[in-house]
Amino acid sequence: MKQTIILLYGGRSAEREVSVLSAESVMRAVNYDRFTVKTFFISQSGDFIKTQEFSHAPGQEDRLMTNETIDWDKKVAPSAIYEEGAVVFPVLHGPMGEDGSVQGFLEVLKMPYVGCNILSSSLAMDKITTKRVLESAGIAQVPYVAIVEGDDVTAKIAEVEEKLAYPVFAKPSNMGSSVGISKSENQEELRQALKLAFRYDSRVLVEQGVNAREIEVGLLGNYDVKSTLPGEVVKDVAFYDYDAKYIDNKITMDIPAKISDDVVAVMRQNAETAFRAIGGLGLSRCDFFYTDKGEIFLNELNTMPGFTQWSMYPLLWDNMGISYPELIERLVDLAKESFDKREAHLI
């Protein structure tokens, strides 16, 4: 009997379009000799819509349903995703997806799911909290200033100018895929950048700009985590923003990255240490800055990295000899392992 995968996609965050792209890639990469895939779309308003079911490989013309094509008569209660023995793959990016919200819901339903648990998902989603945890683990971070809604913005800008040097980057603390991030070269630009960032979150991180290469490491495992050789994001733009990543296609990737063996070793060790520090499970992608001075800064941990066919995470593992279909199988097995461990602790 085939294993059922419940594929959740869409979502309420600004990253829902990336989620659809990732979910379509997963849908096509699944080994249908072993799995059946049932899909549920989460609308921007938070409604759950039962969409398609695939018992064999979809054709090239098959597309996952989205806001424009779903049948709203198939709206269901969120709990309708429950199926005994099924494993949920929440291909959801950003708030209300990879921030612990959906993970908590799935634990209430008593369903195994791919990826990090409630705590590690919510922790990694918040850039400010992540920095504080990784600092305690002794992992180098880019200098930063945290700003919370209600703070005196003028005073905080003065703190930024005292502790950091332009250019700086303002980022919503609780957002991914470079949404709401902008670069500032002076005080007026910083004020505008803060306004943009506060549209997406009530907590904002202002980071020192660094002249650096962007290097990424893939992580896979629960309690015995493994890492990939690093890959590098090679940009044709000054700033790797949302449009550059997903719309304009102005990036290429070097896999493996052209860096020394010593730097590779440090990055892999730091990535594994960071994953353990947040209590990671299943998977993550760890992003580093490697400066022209030879400094290595851990930028962020992404607990549900992009899963499109051109995304770094699956390509990193492909370079390690693990194909996209095999990667999905391993993630499903890891989900069942962590579920069994979680249930065993409820004594």
Curated annotation (Swiss-Prot):
Annotated binding of ATP, by residue: 161-216
Respond yes or no to whether keyword Metal-binding is given for this record. yes
Q: Where does this protein hold Mg(2+) 1?
A: 287, 300
The record's subcellular location field reads: Cytoplasm
The keyword Protease is annotated on this UniProt entry = no
Query: In the record's cofactor note, how is the cofactor described as bound?
Result: Binds 2 magnesium or manganese ions per subunit.
Associated pathway:
Cell wall biogenesis; peptidoglycan biosynthesis
- ATP-grasp domain residues are 131-333
Keywords (A to Z) from UniProt: ATP-binding, Cell shape, Cell wall biogenesis/degradation, Cytoplasm, Ligase, Magnesium, Manganese, Metal-binding, Nucleotide-binding, Peptidoglycan synthesis
Q: Which cofactor does it need?
A: Mg(2+); Mn(2+)
The record's annotation in PROSITE patterns points to:
ATP_GRASP, DALA_DALA_LIGASE_1, DALA_DALA_LIGASE_2
Instruction: State what this protein does.
Output: Cell wall formation.
Q: What is this protein called?
A: D-alanine--D-alanine ligase
